[in-house]
Regions:
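Glycine-rich phosphate-binding loop of ATP-dependent small-molecule kinases
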Residues: 1-249
């Protein structure tokens, strides 16, 4: 039951150790963030959690959590399958991604709602999310789609640089190093990853559109889709995001 006692228990118990939790929200809510790579979903997710609370479940973080195998515990069945696939360099199957999200969404903190970033990416995953929520007698409150012109996304992603030694990230326009081409932290060489080159970015955007457009149509048909122009700076984009979420409270 969602009560003051449960909220206090969450703050003092396992929920306090959740990697990406914010303040306890006024009521449980469930939100998905959609949009192509480079559109700024992660930044908006952090702002949402800081302002409104709930768990931030990113599929990227789920995989990193699985790979780290926190606290030395034996991996869950889904984690074990994901780890084996990643070790082989293979793609993790839809079923395994769904199982990992189901496991993470079952943590104590997530009973107060969660924000999904990077999931669902396929129509099959969208159906699976309906099942995950249905099992706990919850429904999705909204699916927020962030969009921006392709040229702007390519500019954002192609400007990224990473230190060859310590992996610290930079951006030629938004977060430049003090010395061009050199890492502030260790002096290592800054490189552009292959998947941050313009042609690779175009390929990623095409692949995203092919798999995610049916997801957008699905949520549009259910009356859950909200569209946000993410061309502006993060704060101005968050003003649009905030207005949407405040209507859910």
């Amino acid at each position: 039951m969602y009560s003051l006692g449960n909220r206090i228990a969450w703050l003092q118990g396992p929920g306090a150790n959740c990697e990406k939790t914010g303040p306890v929200p006024p009521r449980p809510w469930h939100l998905v963030l959609l949009g192509p790579p480079g559109v700024g979903k992660g930044t908006q997710a952090e702002k949402i959690v800081g302002k409104f609370g709930a768990c931030h479940l990113s599929t990227g973080d789920v995989f990193r959590h699985a790979a780290r195998n926190l606290n030395g515990n034996a991996p869950s069945p889904a984690m074990a399958i994901a780890l084996a696939a990643m070790k082989r360099g293979a793609l993790v199957s839809d079923d395994t991604v769904v199982d990992l999200v189901r496991e993470r969404a079952g943590c104590l903190a997530c009973q107060y709602g969660f924000l999904l970033d990077g999931f669902p990416r396929t129509i099959e995953q969208a159906y699976a999310l309906d099942g995950i929520l249905g099992n706990v007698k919850r429904t999705l409150d909204a699916a927020v789609n962030f969009f921006a012109p392709e040229a702007l996304i390519i500019e954002r992603l192609s400007g990224r640089r990473v230190c060859k030694q310590c992996r610290t990230g930079y951006h030629v326009a938004n977060k430049p190093p003090r010395q061009a081409g050199r890492c502030d932290a260790c002096g290592g060489e800054l490189i552009q990853r292959d998947d941050d080159k313009p042609e690779a970015i175009r390929t990623r955007l095409q692949a995203y559109a092919a798999t995610c457009n049916p997801v957008l149509d699905y949520y549009r048909g259910k009356g859950l889709l909200r569209e946000i122009d993410a061309s502006g700076d993060p704060d101005s984009v968050f003003e649009q995001t905030r207005e949407i979420i405040q209507k859910l409270a």
